[in-house]
Amino acid sequence: MTESQGTVTFKDVAIDFTQEEWKRLDPAQRKLYRNVMLENYNNLITVGYPFTKPDVIFKLEQEEEPWVMEEEVLRRHWQGEIWGVDEHQKNQDRLLRQVEVKFQKTLTEEKGNECQKKFANVFPLNSDFFPSRHNLYEYDLFGKCLEHNFDCHNNVKCLMRKEHCEYNEPVKSYGNSSSHFVITPFKCNHCGKGFNQTLDLIRHLRIHTGEKPYECSNCRKAFSHKEKLIKHYKIHSREQSYKCNECGKAFIKMSNLIRHQRIHTGEKPYACKECEKSFSQKSNLIDHEKIHTGEKPYECNECGKAFSQKQSLIAHQKVHTGEKPYACNECGKAFPRIASLALHMRSHTGEKPYKCDKCGKAFSQFSMLIIHVRIHTGEKPYECNECGKAFSQSSALTVHMRSHTGEKPYECKECRKAFSHKKNFITHQKIHTREKPYECNECGKAFIQMSNLVRHQRIHTGEKPYICKECGKAFSQKSNLIAHEKIHSGEKPYECNECGKAFSQKQNFITHQKVHTGEKPYDCNECGKAFSQIASLTLHLRSHTGEKPYECDKCGKAFSQCSLLNLHMRSHTGEKPYVCNECGKAFSQRTSLIVHMRGHTGEKPYECNKCGKAFSQSSSLTIHIRGHTGEKPFDCSKCGKAFSQISSLTLHMRKHTGEKPYHCIECGKAFSQKSHLVRHQRIHTH
């Protein structure tokens, strides 16, 4: 049969099997066939032959059975469908040979018919396996095609021989065959890695040289391998042909779908030999193993920081360059890594694919699910070497370590104040910008932090989720519960070095120290009065604004402070939680109990500088001093009369209003003063 001089196609080097023939191949023979066919296809692609990917290659890539109908095999080879070799092919042959000489990898010269003979070592040409004449011709044709189109040693088939090549490479048995063949005759001079083809070696060398000859025409991204460029193009074309049956998510590659499905099945086939921790992806296992070895082969040239993963180094380098090539189409925010963009996109879509099988809570990131699950398991794998305290998150341990080292890496550019926590730094910056993005729907009050708004809203709802196990008392804030529990334990870990006074709360201790230093850093812009605490300034400002955000739901009376509302509520409930140990008398306020106790002890800590008279209450001393100074700060708006005490003004005002709030239960007579009622009631008792 004469050879036609036409363009070489993939069919020159292709072998077809019928279903019956394919079944007779053992696993080793099938594997070899797959490798050879894919290799020949890649060789033609590499030297620039343009053609559509054949069906058989699709099948081999998807690991499907590549056999064809017997009629198709007959038609191809008995209808003269044979291709010759043109000048272009001969030039490519010469080019390949030059490349091999360049790398000084010379194998023993073998003829095409010898290749056919070696190939028969794995595919024995017996009457059982090759019942028809066209099959014999197929293998004969294959040998000739190799002889014409590729150097014999450029094909895996021709490497199967019992004798060694001149490099004395190690050999191994393949399948059940007693034949041996060379695996990697072409060595990389940089890292020593071996390859069975020169073209594979050429592609590998691009890792060392950084060469990326394949560029995307859409985004100019370059790749070292043509296959990677083809896969990349699918991102632009949105071609996602592999869909998950569980959640409907689609993928460009079948391998990505297989990895994704492990999220649903929970399969983790890759286990660490050191600690037996298992992973759903092999790459994650490889990264994990570096924790045990301590290996960090990837070092940053800018700052010297080392990483166990190459991808982590690449991501880190963008910190120095400021490069953020991945932009969100929704809001324009840019990211240094495509993975970060993918996670960010879920904030727009609301996608939360990772669900907790304990409580049903869903998360947008797998790492967040892992952290959440530790709430259920109680696992705290990150332990402090200094104090032994354990944490469920690595970031929490990092922040905790700063309490030992004193490190405060976050510094405010406005006031130079430094913080150990990033979130505290961000919150602090809002003081300078006066930004209060979180507003209460009930009263319109705005807050710097979301957590402050949540706590504030409990005033309106009355929610008190934190309950004391000792006495059952409930609190709206966890910090208040912790402080309260110290009353039961008697713990006062914070002691003043000046006077020895101890406190159960750190904040109270800090406030107390300002008594000794006299520090009052918080000034009122209205009247200039200074305060030692910002909370005290906030409360004081309400005296200027008249703001009373805390309203009693029983009588509608409003208060400027939550604590005042709580005290007022006891007038409705009759609650008197503070009991005197001496006489059993109960009080609604703690301060009232303290003042009462002085009646038993005789303590009078407040002394007048003018006359030396002492008082059990600070307010009594204040009123007494006005007797010396003549100060009368409380004026009647009706007649202008002034009083030294507000209680005296209140009584006086009843003369103008006619108010008589004190009623006799015996006769119903009313009085403007309580003392008058008491005097009147004696009439009924005598």
From Swiss-Prot:
Outcome when changing Q29E: In a breast cancer sample; somatic mutation
Keyword Metal-binding (UniProt): yes
GO terms of biological process kind: regulation of transcription by RNA polymerase II
Residues in C2H2-type zinc fingers: 186-208, 214-236, 242-264, 270-292, 298-320, 326-348, 354-376, 382-404, 410-432, 438-460, 466-488, 494-516, 522-544, 550-572, 578-600, 606-628, 634-656, 662-684
Keyword tags: DNA-binding, Metal-binding, Nucleus, Repeat, Transcription, Transcription regulation, Zinc, Zinc-finger
Origin: domain of life: Eukaryota
GO cellular component, one term: nucleus
Record flagged with keyword DNA-binding: yes
Similarity comment: family membership: Belongs to the krueppel C2H2-type zinc-finger protein family.
Purpose: May be involved in transcriptional regulation.
Protein known as: Zinc finger protein 569
